[in-house]
Amino acid sequence: MGRYAKEPDNASKSCKSRGSNLRVHFKNTRETALAIKRMPLRRAQRFLKNVIEKKECVPFRRFNGGVGRCAQAKHWGTSVGRWPKKSAEFLLQLLKNAEANADYKGLDVDRLVINHIQVNRAPCLRRRTYRAHGRINPYMSSPCHIELSLTEKEDVVTKATDESEQAKKKLSKKKLQRQKEKMMRNE
């Protein structure tokens, strides 16, 4: 088992999943992974299923040369987007694996959030294509490694407010002096 690029802060409240040398385009997968980062698990699964059905698009921010525009990208504040079906299917499979790991650990699956997802390039696979005049050109593929970790979302606890603290507002020297004088008169 390899080392993860980022270990979770609280290992008992987290679960991980990874895939190596996956035969899916690196560039498309990188953009799809960035779209689901920091999403709750259920929302990310729904988003990826919508991408497969072309109901929601993945915004292409870095690798967007020659990528057409689509109206669904307005939701992300950009105009360039696509529906990388194979990338979405691979990520959905990894999320399913991470969910099974969380279930095994006894975590609450409905409170899981994707706090780390990373896509790295894997070694290229070489094939050949035959060209005119007896030439041969390379026909390369760009596989990738994917790793992700899910963490149970912490409940945000609001600080209890004291009435005495609210009453103690910061007063200017002038107002403090007036209060002292008023107290002296009353005595």
Swiss-Prot record:
Gene Ontology molecular function: any one: structural constituent of ribosome
One record GO biological process: cytoplasmic translation
Coiled-coil features, chain-numbered ranges: none
UniProt-annotated stretches for the region Disordered: 158-187
Gene3D superfamilies: Ribosomal protein L22/L17
Keyword annotations from UniProtKB, A to Z: Ribonucleoprotein, Ribosomal protein
InterPro entries, per database record: Ribosomal_uL22, Ribosomal_uL22_CS, Ribosomal_uL22_euk/arc, Ribosomal_uL22_sf
PROSITE patterns: RIBOSOMAL_L22 (PS00464)
Source superkingdom: Eukaryota
Any Gene Ontology CC annotation: cytosolic large ribosomal subunit
Basic and acidic residues composition-biased segments: 158-168, 178-187
Entry-linked HAMAP family: Ribosomal_uL22_A (MF_01331_A)
Entry similarity comment: Belongs to the universal ribosomal protein uL22 family.
Protein name (Swiss-Prot/TrEMBL): Large ribosomal subunit protein uL22
Organism per entry: Anopheles gambiae (African malaria mosquito)
